[in-house]
Every structure is written in structure tokens, then in C-alpha cells.
Regions:
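Non-heme Fe(II)/2-oxoglutarate
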Residues: 1-7, 17, 153-157, 198-203, ...
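A short beta-loop-beta micro-motif enriched in histidine and acidic residues
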Residues: 76-77, 109-120, 189-190, 196, ...
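Double-stranded beta-helix
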Residues: 133-209
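Extracellular structured ligand-interaction cores
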Residues: 27, 118-124, 134, 191, ...
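Short edge-strand/loop segments of extracellular domains
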Residues: 99, 140-148, 228-234
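Short, structured patches in soluble enzyme cores that scaffold and shape functional sites
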Residues: 107-109, 125-129, 141
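Short, conserved beta-strand element in jelly-roll/cupin
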Residues: 115-132, 195-198, 203, 228-233
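Non-heme Fe(II)-dependent double-stranded beta-helix
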Residues: 1-116, 248-258
Length: 259
């Protein structure tokens, strides 16, 4: 596990106000973190390409979208994530739609190979001021300390004919949601929303319970970029890496389209 997830983080762990907060709560807000001109260039490019508001269907469009990498591989962001996880990280997934995912309660790490073991983080980046009626990102502080339901355990609860299908995570959503609904109710921990302004970001732990809430106004866009990162030394299944200029690293999947 990452040093900050251990009972004793050890002598090499960075302990400051931010890492202590992360250790306790499982997330870290970064107010006004991104230069607006970098965000604007990406937004304008999305509109020009006709990608907005649905986003790319490709889960790794960053391999061929340098303006997205300017944001998701932004060096100060990569440095923050490395500080929290304790090892260099690489970008491995991006969700690019400008509507709420409406994905119900889940933890990210159950979808990872078990050897990742929390060496994982994700970031919610606001490309504009976010209207609270658009379906906000919600999370449960401290839920990263709850026991993780491993993917193999969830798969074992699925019918044998769907257990190993590529879309098994979709089939498992009802199970995961039910487990976390009960846990949240039992814990009594208040649910928090990330009401972000343009340039704000929120980093969250791979085990933090979170969801994309149902929008009150489905016509509203939620202009954001959601990026996921894995420890470079842990991703034995993703051996190809590339660096974005002098910024951060990103993984190349087999048959990745490149710019």
C-alpha cells in the first residue's frame, strides 16, 4: 500500500498539512489550480472538433489529444499526486463528457488488478464554474478507510455467464451500489459535493466512495475533465509510457492512436 495508507507511513513519507488531510479524508481540493488559458484552449478545441458535450468514446483520448494532456499531465498536478501516493504516476484513463456520469456509488480500486493495491488516484477538473443543478460530483470523506470489495469477490457474485464478460463492471453496479448505500447509511458520514469554480481540482483516493449525482436540470452542461492515474511501477499490464513534453507521463495502450 502507499505510505500514507499505512498505520506507520515510515520515515520517507512526506507529512504536511495536505498529506495529513489526505490520510484522514481521502481527497484533496486544489482551488484555482489550473491556468485558465490552458483550460480555454482545450474547451475551444473540443467544440471545434465536434466532441462537446458528449466527449470521446475512447477511454484514452489523451494519447492523441495534446491539449488534454496539457491539463491532465500538468506538472504541478503530477507532483501533487506523486506526493500523495508516494511514487511517480502515469495517466491511464480520461472521462471527457460534459454531462454528469450519473454513475452510482462506487470505489475505483475494485476495477483495478489486485497488484495495484491503492497506488491509484483520480482527479476532477472544472473547466468552468459548475452549476449545482448539473449533477455534481459527490463523495464520502474518510470512506477510503472502509474495507475494499475486490473485483474478484464481486465477480463471484455475478451469474457465471456474465462473470468474465468485458462489461462485468456494468453488471456489477447494482451490487456495488447496494453495498455502499448500506455502508453510507450505517456510517452516518455526511455526503459532500464538489461545487467547483473554473480551475479548481479535486484529487481522490482509489478507495473513496463517490458518484456522479443526478442532474436537477438535464439541459445544463458540466464542463469538466476527469483523469485517472496509476503508479508507473505497478502497471505491469501497461508497459508502454510516454512523457508529455516536460510535464507528466501517460500510458499507451495496445493500438493506441497517437498524435
Amino acid at each position: 500500500m502507499p505510505p500514507l495508507d499505512r498505520a506507520d507511513p515510515g520515515p520517507d513519507a512526506v507529512l504536511n498539512d495536505e498529506t495529513r488531510y489526505w490520510r484522514e479524508n481521502g481527497y484533496l481540493k486544489l482551488p484555482n489550480f489550473f491556468p485558465h488559458e490552458v483550460l480555454d484552449a482545450y474547451v475551444e478545441d473540443c467544440v471545434a472538433q465536434g466532441i462537446a458535450p458528449h466527449g470521446w468514446s475512447d477511454p484514452c483520448p489523451f494519447t492523441h489529444q495534446p491539449l488534454m494532456r496539457d491539463i491532465a499531465c500538468y506538472r504541478p498536478l503530477m507532483d501533487k499526486i506523486e506526493m500523495l501516493i508516494g511514487t511517480p504516476m502515469g495517466l491511464n484513463l480520461a472521462l471527457t463528457g460534459w454531462r454528469s456520469t450519473t454513475r452510482t456509488w462506487h470505489q475505483d480500486d475494485y476495477l483495478n488488478p489486485p497488484y495495484i493495491n491503492c497506488h491509484y488516484a483520480a482527479v476532477w477538473i472544472a473547466l468552468e464554474d459548475i452549476d449545482p443543478d448539473c449533477g455534481m460530483f459527490e463523495f464520502v470523506p474518510g470512506s477510503h478507510k472502509w474495507p475494499l470489495t475486490r473485483g474478484a469477490k464481486i465477480q463471484s457474485l455475478l451469474p457465471s455467464e456474465t462473470r468474465f464478460e468485458p462489461d462485468w463492471p456494468v453488471q456489477a453496479e447494482k451490487i456495488i451500489t447496494g453495498l455502499l448505500d448500506r455502508k453510507i447509511e450505517e456510517s452516518g458520514i455526511p455526503i459532500k459535493s464538489f461545487q467547483a469554480r473554473k480551475g479548481d481540482a479535486l484529487i481522490w483516493h482509489g478507495r473513496l466512495a463517490h458518484r456522479g449525482s443526478i442532474p436537477k436540470n438535464k439541459e445544463l452542461e458540466r464542463r469538466s475533465l476527469i483523469a485517472h492515474y496509476s503508479a508507473i511501477v505497478k502497471r505491469k499490464d501497461l508497459p508502454r509510457l510516454k512523457r508529455h513534453r516536460d510535464q507528466g507521463w501517460y500510458f499507451l495502450l495496445e493500438n493506441s492512436k497517437e498524435d
